[in-house]
Structures are given as structure tokens and as C-alpha cells.
Amino acid sequence: MSKLSTTPLSILDLAPMRDDDLGAAPALQRSLDLARHVETLGFSRMWVAEHHNMEGIASSATAVLLGYLAANTSTLRLGSGGIMLPNHAPLVVAEQFGTLAALYPGRIDLGLGRAPGADMATARALRRDRLGGPDDFPQDVEELQRLLGSRQPGQNVIAVPGVDSHVPIWLLGSSLFSAQLAAQKGLPYAFASHFAPRYLHQALRIYREHFQPSAVLDKPYAMIGVPLIAAPTDEEAEFLATSAYQRILALIRGQSLVLRPPVESMAGRWQPHEQQAVGDFLGLAAIGGPEKIRARLEVLLEQTGADELMFTCDLYDPAQRLRSFEIAANLRGK
């Protein structure tokens, strides 16, 4: 039996907007369509990510979007991938996710990151100067653990809802710091290799070598992000991938991140250094037909020992995006 056939598969969604969308509503509806689709395919979980002031990403109000998705699905685990904790008071996060857990018990994850999820001007608009910064992240995680855990004698501040909910906390990151912290706290770890694969192997090694068993986890559990573009043929997948290339190129250039239709060729659309940067961004990508995808994922599992794969997929046509995840799901039976 192949490793892929027994590895949980999950989704990270940013509610991507298209260049022809009139507002965010179509993107949010597509996120729901995706959640319903992957639920039927047997995916383990779907997370949405917090980003601010990024034209083309509609998942900024992460907890609100999770409530919408959870209300319209029945079994799929849903969570944040992640909440950028420096943007929020831990008590507010505990109340939001405590509410979600009360409404949808056993289905909510709380993934936490310490990156801004925004530029400096936006960070100021979020009042981050009043909330502290990334250096406070370990203490903020501990505070969240207390707020979501069992009520302690003499505890003056409680999250209602939230206390006694024990919402599963994941630590997210693309750095060695996050790996070390997840190991120290005995928490599951998700590495952001879908856009920053450079330190993946080093981070996983640190996480596993330094892992300390905890009340929530007795051994390391690592999930890695993988960009996925699957199609019936390698040629079609390469063509469809140009939408992802254009989006990453726009990110590099500081332009709108709305999804654009695929193009026959990227020649003349990027400079050599930009092409290299896009390639680095997608260093872990699985792009191709079913057999190429299967081989790529098996290699990634062998190289990383990942316990779970979390896919991202930037395709312009919603039906082709759903098909991409369907192809990946069908590979588990082979």
C-alpha cells in the first residue's frame, strides 16, 4: 500500500477573487462550493487564511467565513490557516473560536501564525501597535491555551464561549522559530511550504528532534503545504498553471492578486529574475496529469515524512479547480 493512499489530504483556501468578479460574494460562494465538494471526496479538513488589504483575497474575516462554511457542511473539519495572532487580542480569538466550537463541536481547528498578513500601513490600521508584535507570540499562544482550556481556580478572565472547549491549536510557519515553538509546546505543526519551501526540511527536522509530548499530542504531527494543479493531461495542467504564475508574479510586483485566465505562454510576461522567483515560490508544487501528480506526491511524502498534505490551488475556472482536487482524491485508491 502506498504512503499516499493512507495520508490525510486537506485544503487551504484564500477565497480567491477573479478578474471578472463584481465584489467578494462570488469568491465566498466558490469557497463554499469547494468545501461541499471536498467533503464528499473525503478530505480531512479545509482551512482559510487571514490576509488584509490584499486585492484578490476575500478571506480576511476568517472566523466569519468559517462560520458560513461550517453552517453549510456537515462533517468536514474547518479551521484557520491561520489567524495571525499579533493582529488580535487572544481573548477575542478565544471567544470567536469558542463560539464556532460550540456551534459545530468537533469540527473546528485554530491554526496560529505570527506573520503580519499585511503591510505596515495595514498593520497600523489593525491597531497592532496596541496589541504587541511577533515577539509576544509565545506568550499569546500560552494565553490562548489557558482561555480555551479548563477553567482554573482563581482565573479572573474567561472566554465565554471558549473556556473548556479545548479547540485544537496548530502552529503555522515558514521559519525555524515556529518549528521550535511547536516542538516545545507539543503542538501539531503546519509548514507553509506552499509558498516558502526553503526551510521545509530543516524545520521538520527541528520539530521532530525537539518535540516534547503534551496533553494534546504524544508524538510529532506535521502537515506541509503543497500547491496543486491537476488535470487529465500534463499539457493541460501546465497551461492552467499560468493563472497561478500570473498571480504570484503580481504578488512579487505588488499588484492586484485577482485570478486571471490562463495564457498560452508566459514568454514576455516576466523577467528572468521574476521567473526564478515564481519557481522558488512553487518549489514544492505538484503540476500535471494524474500519474505525474501521484509520483510527485509520493516523492514528497518519502522526502518529508509528512503526516498530512494540505493543498492550495489557484485555477481560474472553478470547475477545473474542483476537478483538480477530485483527481488528487482519486489517487488515494491506487
Predicted regions mapped to residue ranges:
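N-terminal beta1-alpha1-beta2 module of alpha/beta enzyme domains
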Residues: 1-73
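Acidic (Asp/Glu)-rich catalytic clusters
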Residues: 2-5, 39, 66-74, 101-108, ...
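Flexible, glycine-rich active-site loops centered on histidine and acidic residues
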Residues: 6-24, 86-149, 189
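Conserved, mostly hydrophobic/aromatic
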Residues: 9, 38, 42, 50, ...
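Hydrophobic faces of well-ordered beta-strands that scaffold small-molecule active sites
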Residues: 9-13, 46-48, 78-80, 108-112, ...
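Active-site mouth loops of central-metabolism enzymes
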Residues: 13-29, 83-90, 163-173, 281-290
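An alpha-helical appendage that flanks or caps ligand/catalytic pockets
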Residues: 130-158, 199-306
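A conserved active-site cap/scaffold subdomain adjacent to cofactor or substrate pockets
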Residues: 179-198, 203-204
